[in-house]
Curated annotation (Swiss-Prot):
Bias (Basic residues) ranges: 13-25
Biological process terms in GO annotation: translation
InterPro entries: Ribosomal_bL32 (IPR002677), Ribosomal_bL32_bact (IPR044957), Ribosomal_zn-bd (IPR011332)
Source organism per UniProt: Protochlamydia amoebophila (strain UWE25)
Family: Belongs to the bacterial ribosomal protein bL32 family.
The protein's name in its UniProt record: Large ribosomal subunit protein bL32
Organism domain of life: Bacteria
Matching PANTHER family: 50S RIBOSOMAL PROTEIN L32, LARGE RIBOSOMAL SUBUNIT PROTEIN BL32
Coiled-coil regions listed in the entry: none
Keyword terms, alphabetized: Ribonucleoprotein, Ribosomal protein
Listed Pfam families: Ribosomal_L32p
Entry keyword annotation includes Oxidoreductase: no
Length: 60
């Protein structure tokens, strides 16, 4: 089993993890209603995805 040669101080340990922060989510703008939405997902406000309106089982 591997054993560390020297103990890392808290400052060195935390500075190694400085680049591990989460990146903010990139948002797209809905072309139908103009609200912010996640890319590759349907709009939560109007329900459109890729300029298509949602169809329900009742409508079919």
């Amino acid at each position: 089993m591997a054993v560390p040669r020297n103990r890392l101080s808290n400052a060195r340990k935390n500075s190694k993890r400085a680049h591990h922060a989460k990146k903010p989510k990139s948002l797209s703008i809905c072309s139908n209603c103009g609200t912010a939405r996640l890319p590759h997902c349907s709009c939560k406000a109007c329900g459109t995805y890729a300029d298509r309106t949602p169809t329900t089982q009742e409508a079919q």
